[in-house]
Amino acid sequence: MDTTSRTRPDDRRGRPTAAAFFDVEGTLLAAPDLAAATGPLGRLWHPPVLAALHGHAALGHLVVLVARAGATELAPITRDLAPDAVLCSRPEAPMIGQGKGYAARALLRECGILAARCYAYADEAADLPLLAEVGHPVVVGDDPVLLRHARRGNWRRLPAPSAERK
């Protein structure tokens, strides 16, 4: 799949048995659009989501960034975080909506990881297909559509980025 890129060598012993998918815009970063983000990345990280990413990495989970942005725009983020994989937009295939769910499913199949053992973190209704692909969805913020799903499915929640970080 050419929307996936590996960003670090697999130096773990054995294969990962779980994955954690992190929507970038508005979830991992407080900025809803990377093109409009200015200043150092450190100010833009959403601390609870960044902590979750580091926690999953420490557990040996496959860490995957999922973004509407393209690979060039994501380069500073991938350099800082060194995820295992990146699912991002290409000119002919934007990474939005159902595309995020399809890409996540394809990556899990390729890696032989059961979706029931996986996590996804996202902030808006358009990310519902990504959240629906995993056994442990986490809603970030207060999108009303996602909150309804979270209440029905007993999904975890994390707070939205604070206004002064945006």
Task: Locate each region found by the language model.
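Hydrophobic "anchor" residues
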Residues: 27-29
